Amino acid sequence: MKILLLKCGDICYDGVVIMLRNILKYMDKTGMEIWLYANGRVADREIADEFSNMGIILVTGGQDGLDDEKTSADIRRLCRAERFDIVHCNTGNNRFSGIALMAARAGGNAVRIAHSHNTNGADKTYSAKANVFRRINRELAHVHLACSASAADHLFGAGCKHIIIRNGIDTAHFKYDEKIRNEIRSALGIPDDTILIGNIGKMINQKNQEFLLNVMSVLKKRQIASRLMILGEGALREMLELQISSLGLMDEVLLPGNIDDIAPYLNAMDVFAMPSVFEGLPVAAVEAQAAGLPVILSDVISRETDLTGNVTFLSLAEGCEKWADSILEASKRKREDTSIRVLEKGFDIRHTASVLRKMYIKIYDKRKGRIK
């Protein structure tokens, strides 16, 4: 069975890449030849090597943005040359998904899967064409998958029949451990009486981390002992560093960069905050809940993200003062082991990988005429 996975953008530490990495890590790949095409570049060699070490054949388009013609040509060429059985497009970008599905159809007769990972696209220039691409995604995909109901509505339009694929994690690995918490906080120089606010995500406009810096400025003015730690890298790092300097937050903000194993750092945090301007069902928020953290999310994020009852949704329009209030309130909650709640909601990565493998096999067997 030959499978082509597609994703928009670079091979980097973003949500889709991490989700694919985790699924493939835990999937039984016996009898499968899996390719991964990204229309961007290899931005993080370490995670690219992880795919290669799992036997995944990695192909990149070398684009800095979304070049429709080149993306289409790349996918058509791959499909014609390799004759894939399944083409599985993973994105929250309507435009990329539509282009990819049209190219896959032109390039062969593979079964086409469209998988929505977001509730909105970052490219506002093409927002007027969203309904056109939704129709393309709905009609050209044989199988419609999504991480949440709102993500499905975004990519396919309301009312389209779809299957939910949970953004699973290794719940046992993220279980809260006070010993690890103390070790990491000591290594970071975080005193016991200091609130450590955490955020994980690529430094791009979508993640809206500049908003958190303004929240930190509010906390500093209130003389609240607090720190902010943002895990990740991205194009906006320099801008964030300038903002940190202009707000006088050099001693309050930590930017460790990309961290392969974030579980120990989640243990060290007191509150997890994600003021994104759009998301699907973010893996980082699932991981934070498995680690027992109270979570503050912008209200554009799917309510399906609340797995533990310890999630607060706030509008960005409520402003930094309100966000600061909510963070302070959340930091007073007793830390508990909530990993089992996340597991019980079906967000275990082993289950996710098993569900997807069974789906691939069923599609392949039906394609080969083994089942009706």
Regions found by a protein language model. Give the residues of each.
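A conserved mid-protein helix/loop that constitutes part of the nucleotide-sugar donor-binding site
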Residues: 14-22, 195, 199-218, 235-241
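Donor nucleotide-sugar binding/catalytic pocket of nucleotide-sugar-dependent glycosyltransferases
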Residues: 140-179, 313
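A short helix/loop element that forms part of the nucleotide-sugar donor recognition site in Leloir-type
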Residues: 175-190
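A charged, aromatic-enriched C-terminal amphipathic alpha-helix characteristic of glycosyltransferases
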Residues: 173, 334-371
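Short hydrophobic beta-strand element within catalytic cores of glycosyltransferases
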Residues: 285, 294-298, 303
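Nucleotide-activated donor-binding/catalytic signature segment of Leloir-type glycosyltransferases, i.e.
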Residues: 241-257
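Aromatic "clamp/platform" in nucleotide-sugar-dependent glycosyltransferases that forms part
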Residues: 258, 277
